[in-house]
A protein has these predicted regions:
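Generic protein-terminus/edge-of-domain signal
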Residues: 1-63, 67-70
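All-alpha amphipathic helical-bundle segments outside canonical DNA-binding/catalytic cores
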Residues: 146-162
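Tight coil/turn sites that cap or link beta-strands
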Residues: 38-39, 73-74, 82-84
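Histidine-centered metal-chelating micro-motifs
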Residues: 59-61, 77, 81-87, 106
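DNA-binding recognition helix and immediately preceding turn/loop
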Residues: 177-182
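Short acidic-glycine-tyrosine-enriched beta hairpin
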Residues: 66-80
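A hydrophobic/aromatic-rich effector-binding and dimerization subdomain
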Residues: 1-31, 84-148, 165-175
Length: 182
């Protein structure tokens, strides 16, 4: 498979001039969901959203802030994507959900304060339980976020917020602690 085209809303470590992920905040307010085969990235990148990754059929490996992070099949993992990150090993995974949530939306949801603090301080968080989400839900949310009916779009956003509420209540743990926050 060919690499993904450059995204104007993301920064990459192979750019000649670096940009702050916060400078991208005003450019991109929509929630984005992908369901696809993960690809190894040639360089790390960063952006202003909260990223959620769910590999459905195999483990994947990231380099996040120069630390190796394993994301296990079926587990939900989230982090603030202003931290440089790079998918280094897609393994045998053929189907992975990648959510990019605008930070203002993430902060508006009634989630565990400790979870929010960990994410906003650069930690990577994973669910203790697997299989909290299916590809069926991800595909439905993808379609509904592009629906012309604003109420349908809002319903998808509300359901994603509830998915994170379930994540928050079902048990989670930091798997990468920001070195600067210790």
């Amino acid at each position: 498979t060919s690499p993904l085209p450059p995204d104007p809303h993301m920064c990459s470590s192979d750019e000649e001039q670096t940009r702050s992920p916060l400078s991208l905040y005003s450019e991109y307010q929509r929630m984005d969901i992908e369901l696809r085969s993960p690809h190894a990235m040639p360089a790390s990148h960063w952006h202003g959203q909260v990223e959620i990754n769910v590999p459905f059929d195999g483990d994947v490996e990231y380099l996040i802030n120069n630390e190796v992070v394993q994301i296990k099949q079926g587990h939900i993992t989230l982090f603030w994507a202003c931290t440089p990150h790079q998918l280094t090993r897609p393994g045998s995974c053929q189907s992975m959900a990648i959510f990019n949530l605008p930070m203002h939306l993430f902060l508006s949801w009634p989630l565990d304060r400790e979870l929010i603090n960990h994410v906003t301080h650069g930690m990577v968080i994973k669910s203790l339980a697997s299989q909290q989400l299916s590809t069926f839900e991800v595909q439905r949310w993808q379609q509904e976020l592009n629906n012309p009916n604003e109420q349908i779009r809002q319903l998808a956003i509300d359901e994603i917020g509830l998915m994170l509420k379930r994540f928050s209540l079902s048990g989670w743990q930091p798997i990468l602690v920001n070195k600067t926050s210790r």
